[in-house]
Amino acid sequence: MRRRRGTPLGVSWTNCVLLLATGLLVVLISVHAKNPRPHRGLPAPAPAPVPASVDQVATENAHRREPTVDGSVLQRLSGSDRAVDEDEDVDEDEDEGLKHQHLEHRQQFDAYLGTIRRLRRPYRSKYTIEQLMRLHVTPKVSGDIDMDPCKAGGFMGDIALPEGDSGPVVAHTPIDDEEQERQEVEQLLADSPSPVHDPPSVSGAANSGPTKFNATFQLDLEKLKQEVYHEGLQVEEEGLTDIIRKKTKLPSSGPVNLKAGQSQSQSQSANEPVKPGSESPSDYAQASSYKNEVLPPSEQRIHTDKPARLTLAEIGPKFSNKTQSLHRNVDTRKIQSDNKDIEDDSGNNFVAERRPSQIVPTSLPEQRSTPAHVYSNAGGNGMQLDDEVDFLHSRGVVRRRHRRGPKQRRSNQHLEHEVKLQRLREELSRPVIEAHHHQSHHQKQAQHRQHHQSHHRKKHRRQQQHHRRRGQSTTQYVNHSPPGFNQSQQAQQQSVPEMDLLKAETSKDEEPLRHRVARAVTAKKERIWDYGVIPYEIDGNFSGIHKALFKLAMRHWENSTCIKFVERDPEIHPNYIVFTVRSCGCCSFVGKRGNGPQAISIGRNCDKFGIVVHELGHVVGFWHEHTRPDREKHVVIEHNNIMKGQDYNFNMLSPDEVDSLGMAYDYDSIMHYARNTFSKGTYLDTILPIEMKGRKRPEIGQRLRLSQGDIAQANLLYKCPKCGRTFQESSGIFASPSHYTAGALSNETEHCEWRITATYGERVELKLENMNIFKSNNCETDYLEIRDGYFEKSPLIGRFCGKVDKEVIRTESSRMLLTYVNTHRIEGFRGFKAEFDVVCGGELSVDDAVGRLESPNYPLDYLPNKECVWKITVPESYQVALKFQSFEVENHDSCVYDYVEVRDGPGQDAPLIGVFCGYKPPPNMKSSGNSMYVKFVSDTSVQKAGFSAVFMKEVDECETQNHGCEHECINTLGGYECSCRIGFELHSDKKHCEDACGGVIEYPNGTITSPSFPEMYPLLKECIWEIVAPPKHRISLNFTHFDLEGTAHQQSDCGYDSVTVYSKLGENRLKRIGTFCGSSIPPTATSESNALRLEFHSDKSIQRSGFAAVFFTDIDECAVNNGGCQHECRNTIGSYICMCHNGYSMHENGHDCKEGECKYEISAPFGTIFSPNYPDSYPPNADCVWHFITTPGHRIKLIFNEFDVESHQECTYDNVAVYDGESESSSVLGRFCGDKIPFPISSTSNQMYMVLKTDKNKQKNGFTASHSTACGGYLRATSQVQQFYSHARFGNQDYDDGMDCEWTIAAPDNSYVQLIFLTFDIESSENCTFDYVQVFSDIDDVYGQYGPMYGQYCGNVLPQDINSMTHSLLVRFKTDGSVPMKGFSASYVAVPNSGEYDHSDEDVENSYSSEMVTPFPGSLKSIYIEDTQEETDEYSDFSGNQLVFNGQYRGRYSLPKRYYSGKA
């Protein structure tokens, strides 16, 4: 046999290498075999670790190495492969042997590499457990707080403080009793705020003991309250839904939860709003792809008594399992608004048409000629319960209504008046001492006496004021006289200048009841916007209809003042406002802050015309009217009726904070509070105008339009010229003040300003006629200056003087500014007359900025018979990009009436891109060249709100320039975005990529840290970690550092940045353990399975140092044979405990259960229950169960009448627990003990489960309770057909009078609800106005309003079957006080969306999106489609999802009707 040269003893070099590799592999495998755990762990921490600095830890980490394969071994192994291939002298037998050995070792090597890859974990931690346990991190905070009005220090605008520390998050029940609510709130909140100008006192906060606030919270609260006092924070109640609910005695969305038997003031910081074991229906979540599926509630909960973090040495075999839970309260009673007696805004809105008008000059800017003052009332009206109310409707009809209060209030009206009058005398007689304003007690008395000196003078003054108020017209005077007509008398008759009214009111002939005082506007001149120009931006999250609403409110301010709201240009507008949504609801800063963008938040319940106008008033520089220093002469504050903790909203401002503009107190101001703002109840007054004998108390708190005082005040604040006005019409005629009165010579200088505003895409054409102005050198002294824009720095078109006639001037933009100065009026120079027209169409171009295009008259309805053609061009080598932001054009299948036509080129013969109409915004589009043709056409009838669009130059930046993206570049319309590959995520610079946070961790112990820890975490970050332990194990998470955004006075639900911990119960089932924020260390969290999920979220402002946590696993003894427990086994750290079902008691052996004799099944709709032996003591070791069940679609209400159960801070000994469902596995509504009667409790479904458990010591008398039923609730539609009924005794008796019930029926995503009425017998009436059933498309998730209505039904004919357009429906049943009938029954089922028809809003011809929810003046549109055969045919393919009941085809309901009434 031939042998290779140089190979001794017959052993080849290849075999040697393979033998060495095999030995190395054996050694590595033996090392791994020493660890019996299936997952590689980290070394245990050393006891009593010494804190280490971040730099020390970083140095240690620099020397850490990940396990790798020796490079020389790889080289030798790969080299052996080549050695075999290169040897040409090996014989065939040896070749076969070597190849076999090589293949065998190659397989072993591949297996080894596979082992290395499997052991390489997808998540890389920065720290070991030892390092993390001894790491000390200093908390950090970023400096971007000013943009968010809810978070900004020194905030100046509308926002409210919290009512105090909310206490531990434990059992809670709805508050239905007003007295109990009052007592609870008084115990929860601080005793009283500091005086306005006193320094904060926090000495008692830190040493207050367990019944006082947390010291840190008290410091924060006092600091913020001082900002309120010194900075003048102002509050709007409309956006604070929790306060509205409390006023109407509804449960709060963020309830204050109390342990039974515990003092309410024993509180927990809001930094820990949700504790482990605090369960609610929202605690059960889905994995991201199944987040809307139904999750069955789990009975297992986690609770800890240790609020601070655990050290490793403290983790012992025992761990508390006591459970306290949150409760999501459901009540079908609606929230009553402050203005419930004012007509609903959906019926009082109408479009202000543009029409040519000839305008008479006035000394103050006048109101527009269109009736633009009839708008929705979104604020409180402040009317007295028995006041008469006049309503102006869209046709100009005045209808009078009487507000009616409770009978008791009517009967005691005289007594109440005497009480309030006496209280008023005490208020006026009490001395008031303020910084910068001291007034003696005798001066107060003297002023009080002056108020009652002369009865005939008061009567005369009241008559004058009455006539002046009636003379304030809500519409502008329109003159149709010929040009030669002398109009001086007419101008005098039209209106009296506001300043003249003020002078007359404060003349020497009257007592000083309303002297010249400080008006509620800012005294800080730096907060006044330069040139009266307020730039704005609108968040892209708002719908087109909301953007139109904001523009309409801004136009309302422009129409009456010289203030201009303009789209922000980054090059010239460093300071600007941003319309956005913040958690504070309706809030804004007062005036200009001067540090860049400032937010104006239009949140839930704030998207009403009057409220937006009000918030813009704060932007302009207005404070609330009732905060004036002289307010005690005009209103009385009822402090006893103010919600506890909201008194600071009624503090007076000092004269240093407001300017003296000589304006009288304005009860009619849109900036005035309503009478019951922040009251404890809807019918309690917090602020009342002073009532003078024989004079009706004025109304306050209107949110309809700017008052005459608001207009005059704004014009004074911004030094608006006394003559001139703002035009928003499509055409008009105006003239200088002396044009028609040349004979009335005067040496007074005329200074006027006219502002003509059109929409984007329109231009202004002005024709000067009969101009006769003194001709000075370069027109320096007397002139008419015309600018192409909105302020004095806009491009100058020309300055004119002398004589000019028939001069035509055109703008390139959509605005024109005219400034007129006449100093030679005495010499008979008449000035000028002008006529303007607004024309649409023309050539538009854009270079670097973004261009805008709107339909004529937007946001109001476009005009009839319009044809506008725009040619849009951009520089060469670019394309034109067009994006519609809102779109509402008369609909037609072929778009033959009104339409928008877009072509790919400069002319009408260019290739057609599309013709669009209807309500769905067209898709984004771009041209192939550098030009685009856009044409808008309207016919003679049916005008809609029109469209708003932006255009820009477009190029593929990813191809043509150095985009700077580290991984991938994605081209977008008008720009580009960077993207990262899988496993990475985008850095905050939006270009570079970094390792993605989160991941799956399969280790028995380890660490988790927030991104960039210990540095500040990034903005807008979403991280998810999943820790997976071996089967039959549990995972515990212990936080070692915690510093997230969130303080007690900013939030209570971790709405900004948060960490949420879930127990993963299955592949797609999650149960929330807790949600945490702030700086308090969360308690240890333990999973209920072998998987635990951690989610981290950060918002777009304010960063902190983040968090760090250690996790470890523990075996679950309950996983094997249920731990030997007969009923329930609950795992604890290092051990387990056995528990019995309700109605059973534990056997002496600690594992078995024996049956009890205290079980009750209750199905009666009404009744009373008692504890065993009541009124004697209940027995020891009792385990009693009451199971309530009622008619489907109704809920159980439980009211305790007497209650006396052994007391304990955590109700450990004896307790009564109430569950929201059929067993104790349902969510907990409350756990009670002690002798305080619990609050009334309501279930969310038709079942309730109550348990009484007692121990062997100390028995009490027990309880008695009444149970009843309530209609309405939340129904979950599934694939199984379910039913619900109109009233609890359906089939046995008629429904009750005065019912108002709501059912929300929700189906899973990608499904719709099919609602079928099985029986129907409702009192019949015309238009169904007495008793009726309404069906809506659910309630808007953001703003809490009804969606589009499918129909309103009555009579005894079955309504058509209804299929929801979305995945939910809302059914409302309302009855009056007479003629009850049998009621109705209905079935509902969830039907998956078929491929034939998509129920999304995008595919519906008449879009029922959220944009149609909020009506406002000028865009109120009918959301109902006529049930024509043509429309029915269009949806005829619905037959794929038909249902059959009782052998009858029920069909499908696809088109909504407004009313349906019929009889068999």
Curated annotation (Swiss-Prot):
The active site is at E615. Residues 84-96 have a biased composition (Acidic residues). Zn(2+) binds at H614, H618, H624. Changing S669T: In tlr1-I678; Absent and/or mislocalized neuromuscular junctions with misrouted motor axons. It comes from the Eukaryota. The keyword Secreted applies. Residues 954-994, 1114-1154 form the EGF-like domain. Glycans are attached at N214, N321, N486, N541, N559, N747, N1005, N1038, N1327. This is Protein tolkin.
